[in-house]
Every structure is written in C-alpha cells, then in structure tokens.
Amino acid sequence: MAFEDEYQKNLGDGAYLIEYALEILNELYKEYDLYVVTNGVARTQYNRLDLLDLRKYFKKIFISEEIGYQKPKIEFFDFCFKHIKNFDKGKTLIIGDSLSSDMQGGINAKIDTCWYNPDYLKTDMNLNYIIHNLKDLEKILK
C-alpha cells in the first residue's frame, strides 16, 4: 500500500499544460460551462488541477473514483448528466485525447466528440471533430 500511495503522489505531482491550454480555457470559460470528466484517483486528479491552478475554470469535476464507474461506461456519463443543472445533450461536446475512454464514452453517451490528436494518429471511429492543436477549438465552437 505504501508503494501505491507514493506512486499516486508522484503521478499527481506530474502535471503540465498543453500548448494554448490556458489561452483557450480563458476564452471558453467566459462563454461556456466547463466540466472535467476524468478517470483515475481523485486525490491525484485534484492535485494535478491544483498544481496548474485550473479548478477555477470548471463548474464541477467528475472523477471515476468518486462516481464508481469509469469512462467509457454510460453509467459514468449518466451520473455526470444528472449532476449538471439544465443539462442539454445537444449542447454538449466532450474534448479528450483518449479514443478508448473519452471518444468511446462520448459515443456511448450520444454527445458530440472532439478528439485532441496532436500526433495525427488514424482512427476508424466516427467522431464529430478531430483537432491537432487546441487553437483549432476556436473554429469548431464559433
């Protein structure tokens, strides 16, 4: 158990911002309600957000450990949707870098998907949007 605790602490200490992340968050925060939907250990995820001072941008943070289900399970998304005031699937976009959890979860939940794919990888998944740089979000959302 001590090893796991140390591993989670070190994992939580490893946080960095993707290019343009802060700039985009500052813009999106003014116009949209933003939420974090993430798998993982709550302590680790909160620590990462705190290290980068990002919590202030998000209305709520949904973490699999606290919910009891992981993305891409529909139960994870059902829980999130029930806890978002005036939730509207038609006005929802999941943005993520994982095909298996973020994009598949969005498909399962029947919400629009935006895959952040900086490495120009290929996929056969039917996604709404694919971006290679966070600045590309401006084109999608305007």
Feature annotation, model-predicted:
Residues 1-6, 61:
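Short, basic/glycine-rich phosphate-binding loops at helix/coil junctions
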Residues 5-35:
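Short, acidic loop-to-helix structural element flanking the phosphoryl-transfer center
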Residues 26, 35, 40-142:
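Asp-based, Mg2+/Mn2+-dependent phosphohydrolase catalytic module
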